[in-house]
Amino acid sequence: MPGLYFEEFEVGRVFNHAIRRTVTEADNVWYSTATCNPAAIHLDEEYCREHTEFGQRIVNSGFTLGLMIGLSVGDTTLGTTVGNLGMDEVRFPNPVFHGDTLRAETEVIEKRESRSRPTQGIVTFVHRAFNQRSVLVSQCKRAALILRKPAP
């Protein structure tokens, strides 16, 4: 499904994204390694069993953030985004573990025309990710530069 143009976004609309993704150990190890993050809470099962309240490794929050936004792309900005302008209020209220299946929802909270780019507009979203038990695991506010509909 192609993304929406600036004019097609309505403030207050909530997208419940159909695509879900089960997070694997390979995802976590790959992401942590690729980003040079050697933290034991992501990579060392024995350390986590003995020294953390979770008793197991937690998924790297950078991966969780990227997955949450990625799950939204097909319904919202696929092919119509020019780029991200920024993210605010990034939160991880609960951990993600290997084997958790995440789903996401996106709310449009603001939109405005770009003063410097007449063929584009700015849309602000709140993304939320939930695990298989509907527990909130991640949330952020994201501003994106979105194409306007081409002139007929």
Predicted regions and their residues:
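Conserved interaction-surface patches within small, structured recognition/assembly domains
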Residues: 88-90
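HotDog/MaoC-like acyl-thioester-processing domains
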Residues: 1-11, 92-101, 105-152
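Hot-dog-fold acyl-thioester-processing enzymes
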Residues: 1-86, 151-152
